[in-house]
Amino acid sequence: RGDLPKAHNGTEKAKVKLLLSHDPSHWEAQVRREFPDVDVTFSGHTHGAQFGVEIPGFRWSPVQYFYKQWAGLYQQGKQYLYVNRGLGFLGYPGRVGISPEITVVELSRA
């Protein structure tokens, strides 16, 4: 189990704080409340439930009934969460309507 206070210790002088946290529900449960200086959290875990519908302007998956943030970019105030649907699977060895993904994040100085 992770220890966010321990991981966060010593980051006071960092201009930008990026966090990798497997489960996106961790963002609302702890990161946003206790660590408002974390700029971006990167998560996965949901796999988009490996099933859903995704067309321009509409995205649905049954995973949204279990995870408020389940795929893509979310923002609350100055904090961001990005949830990647990943490449793998759990249980059924495939995907229907939810493509696997690899995200490339390019960081640059403002």
Please annotate each region the language model reported.
Residues 1-110:
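Soluble catalytic domains of enzymes that build or remodel membrane lipids, polysaccharides, and related
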